[in-house]
């Protein structure tokens, strides 16, 4: 995947949109990168809070936050508008990982850099063959003055219209 084979190693983007696999193992990518203790890829090991090797390596059983870190590494920092990311996650990205572990470090890094603009809770049954709760994370590295230090939480769980005919477990669309 793009975690171990970055197709755009030195490119930055204005807008990035993705829906990474939920709960999918990224062990193959981890092995290709050299194993958990050996990763030196600057997308996943950075300097933060005085730690020269602040690690953002998650459990190999769920790589969705790793895909977000990959996107964060591709934000434009030298332009007036910077970059904006919208990425769909299941609920595990909000709470997995103990303090000091990769998932927790990623969330801390995002919050301390004030990149998280909003989290939108979507209606259940929005995706084919899964009824799990999903959330859109909106991130930017150029918040407006009035939005700095704030994160907007949007409950859109009731903003749906039912489908006439189910598509697997998908039974509604965002309205």
Could you describe each region identified by the protein language model?
Residues 1:
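SAM cofactor-binding core of SAM-dependent methyltransferases
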Residues 4-175:
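A conserved structural/catalytic subdomain of Rossmann-like adenosyl-cofactor enzymes
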